[in-house]
């Protein structure tokens, strides 16, 4: 494999798409050795086919705001790869959304979904529409207008979206309702639905729950008990909430959360009503965490900074891509962090990842750590297909088993001669091998 040649070609075809190119390069570096052991992959040009999406839909979304003024946004759906199942991946509503971000997320999703062992391909979609500051009626009208274009490309065996940043249960409900009206079918075409119409128990907290199950497995490989360990978390939405809830349940102490305005440090631990307050902060729509310090004496708000300067045993990025950089990694390493688990997608910069691996710090990438969310989406698809509903305990048990299996795959492919587990390499190889063999088995298409 000539990585330099492949990347040069992609950079020429997709200039400026930094997030997408970063994601592709990371995977290629990890799989180079094993790819070169399979000449049949090169003959079938597996890499060249895998790094480009099957198709991309870009469309205008026109809607009317509460003032009666016409607004326009861009909508996207990237159907990346369906070698192992229907396209599966969330929809993101945020002002920062662009094609590069969605292609990176769809590419990552392809491998993440493969790791779950469930039959799901990779995809991602979204819009540069931001729900922040919008009324409920405006959000409903936008979701309906968005689906007027996208519905024709979706289906339970074709492409199954879910939520993501800016898209929660409310937005999924509005989109599913419009899809149902347009198709006149009630099928499992969306996941993350309300419990009353086909949703799965523990789906909102599944990404955070699964992340902690994975991190706990990482610690156990070193004989370390998570009980009593301090945890630094970024973000304060559903993912951070789920992570904080499960970390506390496992006996750890969460000491930070963060938002665009800065971070909260609570040495007494964020548990009980404090965890519930995270959801109140998110529901307020203000996108700030500063009010936490006013609500709970003994905690401190640090404006304009990220939580990685706090001494903690475990660091869990739960907010967005590239939120933990090289300087942050140095701070964590200097503070003797035991484990870093990306619960956000591509939460660490390449420089940060290199530093963790160089210092033999336990680090695992988002495609493995945060796979609990899409795994539970897959379980929701299964429940919809069988027209039944599992209990929370059943779903949680299956989620725990899936995360245990993902960790085992990472250990299998990522263990180095000195015993260090390179989870980046392990996750990339495990996901790639499944997708590559599936593509080989289906011919040149």
Curated annotation (Swiss-Prot):
GO-annotated cellular components: cytosol
Annotated GO biological process: glutamate biosynthetic process
Alphabetic keyword roster: NAD, Oxidoreductase
Positions of transmembrane segments: none
Matches recorded under SUPFAM superfamilies: Aminoacid dehydrogenase-like, N-terminal domain, NAD(P)-binding Rossmann-fold domains
GO MF terms held by the record: glutamate dehydrogenase (NAD+) activity; glutamate dehydrogenase (NADP+) activity
Matches recorded under Pfam families: ELFV_dehydrog, ELFV_dehydrog_N
Catalytic reaction equation(s): L-glutamate + NAD(+) + H2O = 2-oxoglutarate + NH4(+) + NADH + H(+)
Entry binding sites for NAD(+): 235-241
Coiled-coil residues: none
EC number: 1.4.1.2
Keyword NAD among UniProt keywords: yes
Active-site positions on this chain: 124
Induction of expression: By high peptide concentrations.
Record text on subunit structure and interactions: Homohexamer.
Name of the protein in its database record: NAD-specific glutamate dehydrogenase
Organism: Bacteroides fragilis (strain YCH46)
Gene that encodes it: gdhB
